[in-house]
């Protein structure tokens, strides 16, 4: 099995950048409100640890996505990669969030922000693999 290391690293970076946009200018204020986070409480966070760990977790996700694409004998191209990424994002991640958020009585807005982020991340990662791998 040959891993596509350039695509893996680029996909992880892209996921990280999507997060910066998603939880920053796009939905940052709504997410903080839904989570009950204030600017004061956010100021005490160890952002180096959070960002570093987030990037490592994005690397793991990208690596596993590459492994998944290679495990099944199917053509790798943009369309196929996006279909698989959508199945993962919507079919596994968003549904898992939905169940957890229902039982923990989280706001619907938080579900849409967080699930939408992961669907978008997997679609972006899938596009990168479809174009580069």
Language-model regions, residue ranges each:
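Juxtamembrane/disordered regions of integral membrane proteins
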Residues: 1-133
